[in-house]
């Protein structure tokens, strides 16, 4: 019994000591926590009660972060980075275009094409940088048409050279050679070229039914010779205001792939013997269907990338009977912006005259009924006098 009483007392003693220790520990821990909390409250209260001078000093030592300003800086940097990427993309695209052009020219040089072989020999020279190149399509029999243009809207002699150096504009009559090279027709053109210095000769046999081929060769040869923003094709019975044309093109200068003209969609003519007959009419669906939208052939412009595309792929591009349809078909499956600009297809007086008087001179004028100016040799001067923008307009224009 004595032993049991001792064990019970010992057990009770140990428990009491542990309880005492735990109580003291809890008290001390509580005091510590309360002191910490009181210190925090005093700090916050001190900040709130601090004087304006103390607050300013605190801000100077610990400046606040302007989150809105920081967010604006980030957005600005992102925008700048995006612009840099776009510039690099454009540069890479231009280099790819240059490489493709050089390869195509070198390939043609190996094929023995005289016109392009000369271009290959000139590849060591840097192509002149130009605003636009205008090719005026003409024929051996069109001397009077050429003279009517030289006497109106086409600068001559030193003025033509000045146009190139000051405005970056190349203008040439475009013609190939006869079916008998070195014959009378070719000698006549050579003599005319010696006099006016305004021809661009192609390695092409002239013929009315070869206009699609001539157009293709023109763009390929022009892009190999001149590095321009735009390449223009115009017929030799159309009146052009160069200042207005330049201003029109300048609005689209930053776009990589543009096709500018008066867009139309005429009927596909299946009947043989009619003008503009389409032998491959069946490709366009049922009889009576219309062509896809394309620029009318009197005048249109394409950007450098598209001219290069024609040059690189000319062996693969299909030619239809009509030149304007052929050109439109080459772009129909590409990422190209078609720009329908009606200032490029004004009618002759009174239409273009009224628009000029209203302060909106036309870029080009012709008669739809004649697919050009009717009796252009006789009427070109009249159209120029009544619809022209003024001979000095091109020199006062800034592109």
Swiss-Prot record:
Keyword field contains Translocase: no
MF terms (GO), sorted A to Z: galactosyltransferase activity
Swiss-Prot/TrEMBL GO biological process terms: embryo development ending in seed dormancy; protein glycosylation
Ranges that cross the membrane: 13-35
Pathway given in the UniProt record: Protein modification; protein glycosylation
Segments on the Lumenal side according to the record's topology features: 36-399
Main localization, broad class: Golgi
Sequence similarity: Belongs to the glycosyltransferase 31 family.
PANTHER family associated with the record: BETA-1,3-N-ACETYLGLUCOSAMINYLTRANSFERASE, BETA-1,6-GALACTOSYLTRANSFERASE GALT31A
Known function: Beta-galactosyltransferase involved in elongation of beta-1,6-linked galactan side chains on arabinogalactan proteins. Required for the progression of embryogenesis beyond the globular stage. Beta-galactosyltransferase involved in the biosynthesis of type II arabinogalactan. Transfers galactose from UDP-galactose to a mixture of various oligosaccharides derived from arabinogalactan proteins. Forms a complex with GALT29A that can work cooperatively to enhance the activities of adding galactose residues at O6 positions to beta-1,6-linked galactan and beta-1,3-linked galactan.
Protein name: Beta-1,6-galactosyltransferase GALT31A
Native source organism of the sequence: Arabidopsis thaliana
Recorded name of the encoding gene: GALT31A
